[in-house]
Amino acid sequence: MMDFSSVKRIVIKVGTSTLAHNTGNLNIRRVSKLIEVMSDLKNSGKDVIFVTSGAQGVGAAKAGLHSKPKEMPKKQACAAIGQCELMHIYDREFANYNHTVAQVLLTRDVISNKTRKENVINTVSYTHLTLPTNRE
């Protein structure tokens, strides 16, 4: 097992296959356990950045669809629905450990634009008292 005792910042990336059951519905037990582990890392003094995708799949399930849509407008609608659902659950679960979450939306255009990229870096740096949650 690797020794992470000297590591200051830990980035944890999860996607739909980790967050959801095969039905597309959230695996609440798994999400809760993941947040418990991240909160413990945060409590031990680590900076934790949680990068999560899966909004589209979660949104499709919440909208009653049996699969992710193919058309862009439906994809966008499902992502919007799913993002609200994910952030609601993350906020609720992290609150159990007295941690505040912040959302930073990461897209290719944000990373490729110098000013936007600096804004993201500043936000993540400033939120040293929170556990930032990012979506790719």
Report each predicted region and the residues it spans:
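A charged helix-plus-loop insertion that forms the helical arch/lid used to bind
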Residues: A61-Q83
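Short, charged beta->alpha transition segments
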Residues: M1, L86-A95, N119-Y126
